[in-house]
């Protein structure tokens, strides 16, 4: 039996992305997007709500996110839902859902005078950078 874990979201960045690096030097960029949930037609008591998703990118996609994404930009994110687990200094176990993205695309346009040629032509890699075990000097097979 095979299982499937894929999530596609469209939302706006709630703040500028944050960048850090793994111990091996791989760039990691995180950002949060707000996604509106529209009320159902058959449920008049439903109110529009907003969900917030933490997005994580690795490698070249992380460099792209750091360089071109800013607060307020509308983006499409495609990736996998993961559960990040850690323990606090007091020994309390925590779990937090996050989306490990392998595709990030603009869904809006910046005003023409602020868009760089590089930004509009950039092809976002659709590779899986969720593993920190690769080396750029080694072939991928």
UniProtKB/Swiss-Prot annotation:
Pfam families registered for this protein in UniProt: SSB
Cellular compartments per GO CC: nucleoid
Comp. bias (Acidic residues): 116-141
Region (Disordered): 110-141
GO biological process assignments: DNA replication
InterPro entries: NA-bd_OB-fold, Primosome_PriB/ssb, ssDNA-bd
Domain of life of the source: Bacteria
Keyword DNA-binding set for record: yes
Subunit structure: Homotetramer.
NCBIfam families from the UniProt entry: ssb
Protein's name in the database: Single-stranded DNA-binding protein
Biological classification of the source: Bacteria, Thermotogati, Thermotogota, Thermotogae, Thermotogales
């Amino acid at each position: 039996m095979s299982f499937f874990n894929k999530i596609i979201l469209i939302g706006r960045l709630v703040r500028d992305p944050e960048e850090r690096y793994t111990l091996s030097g791989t760039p990691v960029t995180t950002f949060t997007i707000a996604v509106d949930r529209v009320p159902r037609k058959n449920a008049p008591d439903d109110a529009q709500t907003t969900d917030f998703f933490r997005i994580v990118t690795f490698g070249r996609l992380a460099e792209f996110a750091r360089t071109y994404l800013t607060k307020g930009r509308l983006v499409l994110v495609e990736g996998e839902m993961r559960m990040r687990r850690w323990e606090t200094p007091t020994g309390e176990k925590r779990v937090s859902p996050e989306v490990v993205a392998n595709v990030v695309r603009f869904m809006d346009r910046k005003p023409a005078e602020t868009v760089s040629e590089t930004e509009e032509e950039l092809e976002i890699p659709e590779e899986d950078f969720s593993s920190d075990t690769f080396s750029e000097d080694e072939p991928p097979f």
